[in-house]
Amino acid sequence: MQPSHFSPTSTDAHRFTQALAVGAAPDGTEDAQATYQFRTLWLSDIHLGTRDCKAEALLDLLRHCHAGTIYLVGDIIDGWQLRKGWYWPQAHNDVAQKMLRKARKGCRVVFIPGNHDEFARDFHGLHFGGIEVLSDAVHVTADGARLWIVHGDWFDGVVMHAKWLAHLGDALYIFTLTLNRWLNQARHRLGFSYWSLSQYLKGKVKNAVSYISSFEQLLAEEAARRQCEGVVCGHIHRAELRKIDGSIYANCGDWVESLTALVELQDGTLQLLMWKPSASAPVVLAELPPGSASTGQAEAPTQPQASHVPCAS
């Protein structure tokens, strides 16, 4: 399956380069040390340019983590919402600056656009401030596993064939997030913890559960067809790391609600992390040890070990 051709408008292209250009200057923070060192870091569905993007939490992760390669797996910039009205607060600016600074300091940063930043797909093969733009990619882990990296919207029939319905669904999702924000403000005042209305609805609606299962199966099958041992994707805002019919299926989650990332340790171990800025360490939600591409299943997660290294962020 190949992406549909998209010709960005001049406004789209201007906003894309403008969003990257705002990070041209240093972000004003100098991190003496990074707490965690990873071989690879995957992030998706950040949705910069929206009010529900948790940019401050992401910035905290970027300050504490160093990786040799960072893959931005789509929907990094929310072009759909920016077309409706420009929203770009300082925290979103800081995230862009941090990414560009990492690229300048030698980190390989690869941007794989999704449907919300599809305007960038015509820039395939180009570099902006050291950030490489690709439609998809193949990553080879330390233990030799080939992972196909793609946002995932190519496998969403609504996005590909009924874009008006996709935009309607996005509007309903934004409305749900707004309700969720108000609800959790009230819960916080009453002393209750965070609760996700959108995740609750996804789990209760039969069609949503069926859609997620089909999406995951299709991605795993396509990765195998491409002679890869697994796939890393985003799009559905559902963090996951497991085996499907022998193939690794990894979904980075999002930075709207779940605050999750996929990482590869130096030995090829894959971990799905949930980042909590106030916590002493990220929560490891799932883990696949080296060699899992051929034999293993997800194991009980272990906490990542803090490794103080010179920060290249």
What kind of region is each of these model predictions?
Residues 129-136, 148, 153, 157-167, ...:
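Conserved beta-sheet core of the metallophosphoesterase superfamily
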Residues 152-215:
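Active-site-proximal loop/helix segment associated with metal-binding centers of metalloenzymes
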Residues 40-42, 70-72, 148, 232:
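Residue-level marker for buried hydrophobic side chains located in beta-strands
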Residues 48, 77-78, 154, 238:
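Short active-site segment of divalent metal-dependent hydrolases/proteases
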Residues 2-20, 34-39, 50-142:
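Core catalytic region of metal-dependent phosphoesterases/phosphodiesterases
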Residues 2-17, 133, 200-229, 239, ...:
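Non-catalytic terminal accessory segments
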Residues 140-143, 239, 243-313:
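Binuclear metal-dependent phosphoesterase catalytic core
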